[in-house]
């Protein structure tokens, strides 16, 4: 209650609510705020979003696309702090606002790596500008405002499946099943998923496949 007063903005209130909801530890319990990236991108001004594409890897935050700040930072630069807040402390703060089943850090990391352009501004109170300190750099770098929304790093080469469900024989002993979505329910398209699994298992059995790889990268779960 002490955090909320007559000067509290919508963004601040929503961020506080997220922390309360996230404390439940259930990925199916969330506010509309931050649950749907498309909704958030429609109401957050472009100039308020974080202007770099970044990725959190092993508790380190790296630039994977400098966007319109290519003259200031480079791909693979490690960001040590943003607006004076150490990266580790910033991530810890953001994690407290992400709903995840049993507070899974793996899920929270994936969520951050998807919605970083929104979560970083929320955590910092929507600053008018962003300044970063990068490893190996002496001076703080003031970033230019976003001229397009920074999106999650996606390498199309990692997913050669044209559809959501694919079976591929790599060699005589190995096969790969790609499942890009679990959006198959009994009242909708569950028969499609079941038929795919059944037919794939039949092919694998008939081909005497010994090694099966199940690829669920970029699978956001159900209701996607």
Indicate where each model-derived feature is located:
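Flexible, low-complexity junctional segments that flank or bridge functional domains
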Residues: 1-213, 218-220
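A short acidic (Asp/Glu
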Residues: 222-224
């Amino acid at each position: 209650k002490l955090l909320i007063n007559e000067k509290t903005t919508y963004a601040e209130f929503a961020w506080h609510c997220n922390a309360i909801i996230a404390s439940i530890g259930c990925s199916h319990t969330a506010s509309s705020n931050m649950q749907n990236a498309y909704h958030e991108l429609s109401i957050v001004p472009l100039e308020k979003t974080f202007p770099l594409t970044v990725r959190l890897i092993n508790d380190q935050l790296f630039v994977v696309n400098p966007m319109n700040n290519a003259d200031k930072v480079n791909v693979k630069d490690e960001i040590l702090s943003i607006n004076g807040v150490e990266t580790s402390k910033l991530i810890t703060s953001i994690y407290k606002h992400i709903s995840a089943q049993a507070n899974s850090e793996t899920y929270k990391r994936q969520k951050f790596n998807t919605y970083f352009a929104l979560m970083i501004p929320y955590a910092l109170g929507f600053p008018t500008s962003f300044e970063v300190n990068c490893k190996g750099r002496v001076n703080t770098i003031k970033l230019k405002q976003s001229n397009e929304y920074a999106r999650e790093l996606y390498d199309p080469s990692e997913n050669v499946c044209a559809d959501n469900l694919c079976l591929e024989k790599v060699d005589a002993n190995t096969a790969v099943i790609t499942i890009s979505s679990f959006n198959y329910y009994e009242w909708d398209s569950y028969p499609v998923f079941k038929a795919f699994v059944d037919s794939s298992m039949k092919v694998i059995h008939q081909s005497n496949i010994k090694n099966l790889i199940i690829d669920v990268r970029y699978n956001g779960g159900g209701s996607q």
